[in-house]
Structure formats: structure tokens, C-alpha cells
Amino acid sequence: VHKIIFLDVDGTLNCSKTWQGPHEDGFATLCPDMCDRLKRIVDETNATVVLSSTWRLFPGKGIDKLRVWLAERDITIHSQTKDLSMEISWGNVRACRGDEIAMWLDDHASEFPPLEREFVILDDDSDMLPSQKPNFVHTSFKDGLTDAHAAKAIRILNDES
């Protein structure tokens, strides 16, 4: 079974405490404890990390900084979701994070077949599709990725009810 983590950054790997103060490049420092929790999820599930955060939209800044921080923990970003925010609009309804994740899963179905995969979404925003709710771990900007969130993600990825 292939296991996938859709990773948001702000509100997952950093929080209101690490966001305080000036940030030279506009990107907050990641919280070491939260990065360690992500590492625990990866280690206990052998999951692949896919970046769904808006950090993916800033090559040379956000994503490069993130890759360095995660590499220090032997975590690699496998891929990233496509930004649909400017591409798809149905009337007044904009594409949401859940749409971007659904498109990634569809686009990568040969590599990660639907019947042979488990996925989890780590995000402090709740704009997921109804079908994704069982796979959604709702973090918060106040606290980021907690031990309880990590445990829930591991249960989802390891298909433990």
C-alpha cells in the first residue's frame, strides 16, 4: 500500500508562536518539534510527502527553504499539488485545496493506484472535499502539528480504525 501525506506548512509545521517577529524573506521559521512529529509520521508509515502548501508557489524562497529544513530530518518532498486557484472558477466558486489534492491523486493514479493507497491531509484550513474528510487531520495555526494530530495521521495511513 502506498501512503501519501499532503502537507501544508503554515499552521502545521509552524504556528503563531514561531510566526512572531520579523522574517527577512517573508517565511516563518519551522518549529523543530512539529518537524519531528512529521518525521515520526513518515518513519512509522513509510509515507511519501506531497506539498500542498502555498509555499510551493514560491520557488527559490519558500520551497527551497522548506526542502533544506526537511532534508535535515531525512524527509524529502516527492511532489507538489498544482495551484488551481487562478485556473478553475465555477461562477463565484473558486477551486479549493481539496480540488488540488483530488487532481494530484487523479494525475498520479498510475504511480499510486486508488485501491493501493492511503493518504492523509495535514492542514489548518478546512477547504477539503467531503470525500476527503476521513483523511483530513485539521491542525491549527495556534498550535500547529501536535502529538495527537501525528497519532491520528499514523492511524489513518496505517488503516487502523
What positions do the PLM features span?
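Active-site neighborhood of HAD-like aspartate-dependent phosphohydrolases
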Residues: 1-46
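Substrate-recognition element of Asp-dependent hydrolases with the DxDx(T/V) motif
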Residues: 42-63
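Short, active-site-adjacent cap segments at secondary-structure transitions
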Residues: 13-14, 57-59, 127-129
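Short His-Asn-centered micro-motif
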Residues: 7, 52-58, 122-124
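Structural motif
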Residues: 4, 48, 118-120
